Design a protein with these regions (language model features):
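N-terminal amphipathic/basic-hydrophobic helices that include classical n-h-c signal peptides
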Residues: 1-16
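Generic N-terminal amphipathic, Lys/Arg-enriched alpha-helix
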Residues: 26-41, 58
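Acidic/glycine-enriched connector segments
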Residues: 46-56, 68-143, 151-162
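Short active-site oxyanion
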Residues: 59-62, 124, 165-166
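General beta-strand structural signal in soluble alpha/beta enzymes
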Residues: 63-65, 87-88, 169
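Short acidic-hydrophobic, aromatic-tinged amphipathic segments that line or gate anion-handling sites
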Residues: 104-108, 166-176
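A charged, well-structured terminal subsegment
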Residues: 123-124, 170-185
Length: 185
């Protein structure tokens, strides 16, 4: 919905999200969040890497927390596909970022950087995750950002198998990226 007149609602499997218009010269950005404690060669690591690759192939800039685990895996996938990765790190040195980040923002604000990560994305994809990921999902929804959950927190909607409004579950990296891109138009 580049240069559109306003937000558009998209109905997706498992929920709906609202697409926001983007300024015409800005690349789309998707924040990818998840645990910093996973191994890169684990199943979640491989999923995150595929998410990064697919986003980069779609011309999307990846935003992440810039450290290890899911953040490093998604950055590696995007960088290997020639994409750009913005790592927003919690410390005050760009040197702490993983080697796949093409741009680093050193915040020096600890976990508060979680808000900066999700507010920098037009949509958010959560891959696995722990308590920090849950906080990022909460921030994203409070900001009105669509969230796609890939083996992550979906929270409870009204029915026993429903996710909370604005959180769309995805079964694969391909589905997660497709849902995020559909949400941002």
């Amino acid at each position: 919905v580049k240069g559109g007149a306003g937000p558009r609602r998209h109905e997706l499997q498992g929920g709906s999200v609202e697409a926001q218009p983007l300024p015409s010269k800005r690349r789309r950005q998707v924040a990818v969040i998840g645990s910093g404690r996973i191994e890169l060669d684990s199943e979640l690591g491989r999923l995150a890497e595929e998410v990064g690759r697919r986003l980069a192939e779609g011309g999307v800039t990846v935003v992440c927390g810039g450290l290890g685990g899911v953040m490093e895996a998604v950055a590696r996938g995007a960088a290997d596909a020639g994409g750009e990765v913005i790592g927003i790190v919690s410390g005050d040195s760009a040197e702490e970022a993983n080697p796949f980040c093409t741009h680093v923002v050193a915040t020096g604000i600890g976990h508060a950087r979680n808000l900066a990560v999700v507010s920098s994305g037009d949509a958010v994809i959560a891959v696995g995750g722990e308590w920090g990921t849950l906080s990022e999902i909460g921030f994203a929804r409070a900001l009105g950002r669509p969230v796609v959950a890939l083996r992550s927190w979906t929270l409870k909607g009204e029915g026993p198998m429903e996710s909370a409004p604005g959180i769309v579950p995805a079964a694969s990296a391909e589905d997660a990226v497709a849902a995020a891109l559909e949400a941002i138009g």
